[in-house]
Amino acid sequence: MVRLALVGLGKMGLSHLSIVRAHPEVNLVGVCDPSKFMLELLGKNAGLETFTDLETMIERARPEAIIVATPSRFHGEIVRVALERGIHVFCEKPFCLDWKESTDLSELAERKGLVNQVGYHYRFVAAFQEVKRLLEANAIGTVTHVLAEAYGPVVLRAAGSSWRTQKAEGGGCLYDYAAHPINLLNWYFGMPARVGGTVIKKIFSRDTDDEVYGTVFFEDGPSAQISVNWSDESYRKMSVKLSITGTAGRIIADRQECKVYLRDGTQSATGYSKGWNVRYTTDLTEAVWFYVRGEEYSLQIDYFVKAIASGSTENVNSFAAAAQTDQLMSMMRDDAQAVVSAPVASPASEQRRRPLFGRLAEGRAVGHDAKLAFWR
């Protein structure tokens, strides 16, 4: 049994709480949160050991591992405390708001030999795992371009104060929504060489962003367009979709299915034939012992627990992988600011801005010689 503690009792924290309590190989030894109301509720009705202070919980509960589900700006400090005490860490996404801190913590976890994982759950969605398998099998040949999208109805009006509406807390469409398709791009293609044309816009939010658009360029690899909007009421809930074009076919994947088009039947994608093929997530997903929000949430926690039990520090969602995503988001934010602050080109001269027929009329006014000179 893995002795595990949980830090943070927001929406994701409560989701993780329900999963780990049902896990047959986990002993939940403590929960930590500043909300005394939530702690009293859980202590009285669930019989859990509750704490308002992280250091006290570590000292008394002696966890082998912790799940960090606090607002993003607290991640770095909490993760560092845990790692320095030899505790394995699962941290919610985004990992850190400063990618340099993400990289530093990744290196610390590696030096300590500790299991480290970040909650990018789309890497545990069967359809996106199938995309990974197909790309590694070179099923669609050389990938030339990707469209990575995410849409949903998170902010549909001017909102009150919460972490989602505050840039300093890690709120905003870029870090909360765009992080997911960006993380998938990192998983499939690594770290891009550069970004360009990034647009980060507000629709309803005052302090942070509601739309993110831009292009990333992978060295000796594809280009990828990112299109994300969390103020889109046409979607009932969050939707992430990737459309991948290659020299020998195409892949379109979301949480529900993986559609594959192959130009011929000679590719190495086992089980796929020429033309369109569809694999549904329900056919690709393994059964889980406990379901909440989606199988991928249980699968990622089970993966973390099994890594601890086996002593393996290799992880599909490691701190190092998440640091790439943090860095790419930082590159896009810097690019968007550079575009906004770029100087505006000087207006054309009066002569060049004058319409063609205006110049012809001027030629007629000054005489036949001027008109001939114009046409020469």
Language-model region placement:
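Rossmann-fold dehydrogenase core element
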Residues: 104-122, 141-146
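Beta-loop-alpha module in the N-terminal Rossmann-like domain of NAD(P)-dependent dehydrogenases
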Residues: 16, 48-108
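NAD(P)-dinucleotide binding in Rossmann-like oxidoreductases
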Residues: 204-207, 222-299, 315, 372-376
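C-terminal helix-rich "cap/oligomerization" subdomain common to oxidoreductases
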Residues: 65-68, 289-291, 299-376
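Short, Asp-centered acidic motifs that coordinate Mg2+ and/or phosphate
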Residues: 30, 64-65, 145
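N-terminal Rossmann-like dinucleotide-binding module
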Residues: 1-45, 372-373
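Predominantly a Rossmann-like dinucleotide-binding segment in NAD(P)-dependent oxidoreductases
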Residues: 122-205
